[in-house]
């Protein structure tokens, strides 16, 4: 899945990089001491071919978004969850809708946890989904038709959640 690091992956139909990097050059590119930014080099290795060497983003010292698989997984979850819960925009902004939305997202994330995308021995260690009055919304949100959802996912370490928030505009009361 997208949560697997795209490092050490061979490139098809590539003869060799225009610039050959050795370990010393790679060390200079790997992590800039000041910014934490890394360059994921394309390197040629004898007997292995041409490989993507690294899986870091340019987020540098940001512990949450440092790795490509984390960003790719969050992008996938955000898009999937927004699309799969879009039906809710035609529903009343009430507890019944929130329970259905939470249930759908929890089922989806449970499947991703079983596939190995999330860290943790239990689903409680791997993710949480919040949606409701006094939790992610106040009375004004409900009157204005905003359903706010908060999802915490442990992609790198159990119970260390990175938060994803999104809203849908639902029917107003």
Regions found by a protein language model. Give the residues of each.
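Structured, hydrophobic secondary-structure cores that serve as assembly/anchoring elements
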Residues: 1-173
């Amino acid at each position: 899945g997208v949560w697997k690091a795209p490092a050490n992956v061979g490139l098809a139909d590539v003869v060799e990089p225009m610039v050959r990097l050795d370990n010393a050059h790679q060390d200079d590119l790997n992590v800039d001491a000041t910014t934490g930014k890394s360059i994921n080099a394309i390197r040629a290795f004898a007997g292995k071919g041409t490989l993507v060497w690294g899986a870091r983003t340019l987020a540098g010292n940001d512990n949450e978004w440092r790795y490509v698989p984390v960003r790719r997984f969050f992008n996938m979850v955000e898009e999937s969850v927004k699309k799969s819960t879009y039906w809710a925009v035609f529903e009343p902004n009430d507890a019944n809708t929130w329970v259905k939305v939470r249930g759908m997202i929890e089922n989806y994330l449970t499947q991703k946890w079983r596939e190995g995308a999330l860290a943790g021995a239990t689903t409680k260690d791997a993710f949480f989904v919040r949606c409701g009055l006094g939790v992610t919304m106040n009375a004004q949100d409900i009157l204005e038709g905003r359903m706010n959802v908060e999802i915490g996912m442990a992609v790198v370490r159990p119970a260390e959640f990175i938060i994803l928030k999104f809203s849908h505009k639902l029917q107003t009361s």
